[in-house]
Structure formats: C-alpha cells, structure tokens
From Swiss-Prot:
GO MF entry, a single one: pyrophosphatase activity
EC number: 3.6.1.-
Family per record: Belongs to the Nudix hydrolase family. RppH subfamily.
Protein name: RNA pyrophosphohydrolase
Originating organism: Laribacter hongkongensis (strain HLHK9)
Keyword Hydrolase: yes
Pfam families: NUDIX (PF00293)
Domain Nudix hydrolase: 6-149
Protein's gene: rppH
C-alpha cells in the first residue's frame, strides 16, 4: 500500500534500556545494522503495527516495553532506484514512518530474534543513543537523525548530539 506520493506507511522502533542505549539489530546474512521497522497494514494503527513488528522482529510483547514517545509527524526517506523492486519502479519512492521510542521493561534475555519463521535480524547489541546515525545505510541516515533528535527530549540525562560528538575520539584516542 503506497500513499499518493509513492511512500509506504511504516513504523520505526527505537528500544532503549535503562542506560539510554538503543537496540541495534544486524540484518540477516548482511553486514548492515538498523532499528526494527515494518509496514502498516490497511486499517492498522501505527501503534498496533509497532507492537506487531516488535513481536515479529524482536520477540517482545507489549508487557516487555513502555512507550515513552513517538514522532509527531511522518518522517520520510527515499530508497535509491537500484534497491526498488522492478515491479514497483516508477510508483514507489520510499517509506514514510512514525517512530516510537520504547523503554525495555523486561530483560535482555526476553529478546528473541527467532520469533517468526522469517527473522529480520541474526544479531543485536546495545549501542550509544546517537551511534546509529553514523552507522546506518546512507539513505536512511537523515530520517534516523530526525527521529533520534525529536525523541531525545523524552530521555533524561541524555547528552545532546553536539555534546556527544564533542567528546568523541578516534580509535587511537585522538580527538575527532
């Protein structure tokens, strides 16, 4: 289902632990990492889609998480043409997403990447809140930055991205 501008309605999910680190999933048989996300079915609310995708991709139920916040508006990204299925070329532009920020209230061991027969991830880790912006595939970078920035206001004690970058160092310990 595409909107009239060629964007597929979708939800993005940012799961935080008590240290404000975010769940970062490694895509099956790939070397790329991303947040859980997925399409909204016709007649489904963004919140219902988020809970369905949360179970399908991460194996977490509503009782394992608490919604902390969500983006006010749809955030969009365009998918490069060479990534678009041939039958969708010409009509499909990308995804429009409502992003949810969740707090994991369960345990790390509640995460189950094999909750369905078609897993999206084959590995995961906790990552610094701002780190995904630098490590996600380039065409999603801007939407990740918009989502993380908008939702950061819900987290106490989280450094701004600028403050986080100011203290960043290279692998050899030299300032960036």
């Amino acid at each position: 289902m595409l909107d009239r501008d060629g964007y597929r309605p979708n939800v993005g999910i940012i799961i935080c632990n008590t240290r404000n680190q975010v769940f970062w999933g490694k895509r099956v048989r790939e070397h790329s990492w991303q947040f859980p996300q997925g399409g909204i079915k016709p007649g489904e609310s963004p919140e219902a889609a988020m809970y369905r995708e949360l179970m399908e991709e991460v194996g977490l139920s509503p009782h394992h998480v608490k919604i902390i916040g969500r983006t006010r508006d749809w955030l969009r990204y365009d998918v490069p043409t060479h990534w678009v299925r041939r039958e969708w070329r010409g009509s499909y532009r990308g995804q429009k997403q409502i992003w949810f920020l969740l707090r994991l209230t369960g345990r790390d061991s509640d995460v189950c990447l094999r909750a369905t027969h078609h897993p999206e991830f084959d590995g995961w880790r906790w990552s610094d809140y701002w780190s995904p912006i630098e490590h996600v595939i380039d065409f999603k970078r801007n939407v990740y930055e918009m989502a993380l920035t908008e939702l950061s206001r819900y987290l106490r004690g989280l450094e701004s991205r600028q403050a986080s970058d100011a203290g960043a160092v290279q692998p050899d310990g030299a300032p960036l």
